[in-house]
Amino acid sequence: MKKKIKVIKIGDVYTESHSRMIKEANLWKDSVVADDLFLPYRNLLFLTIASAFAQSIGVGTVYSAFINSNHAKEIDCSLEFFMKLRKLLQEYGSVEVVFPYRNYTKTDVARLGISLTVPIDSTYSCQVNPEIPCGVCPNCVDRLVAINNVMRGYIKND
């Protein structure tokens, strides 16, 4: 049975936020530091909404693609946070949240994507632009470094 992806708008939660993820920054011109891109409890919202929706339609597992990145210091990106949330959701509901890529680095993900012939040029994880990678936010820089690392490995092996 084929399932459709359901889009749930949660943007209204952050209408008063000063985060540059909401009030879009021009990272080529503006002076923006990583803290300016922080949205409090963003991942908590994503995972609890996905879990609530899953439980309401009888789906028992939610998959998350969080990886082990340098952003793991943020309170709702840490392994401890994910494990506590997972336990809470299992104890008070019927949904399990699974993190199959949690121990992957961005380079590991790029390597996997290339090995699966994913069109890497169509991927992005931009913190600022929802349509095309900005190329300068921390996630875009990490992505470019990861792809570069993988490609260097392929060149060495030829």
Write out the residue ranges for each language-model feature:
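Short linear functional motifs in flexible/disordered or boundary regions
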Residues: 62, 74, 97, 125, ...
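Local cysteine-cluster metal-coordination motifs and their immediate loop/turn environment
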Residues: 44, 48, 122-145
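Glycine-rich nucleotide phosphate-binding loop and flanking beta-alpha elements
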Residues: 70, 147-148
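Short cysteine/histidine-rich metal-coordination sites, predominantly Zn2+-binding motifs
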Residues: 129-130, 151-158
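ATP-dependent adenylation/nucleotidyltransferase module used to activate substrates
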Residues: 1-117
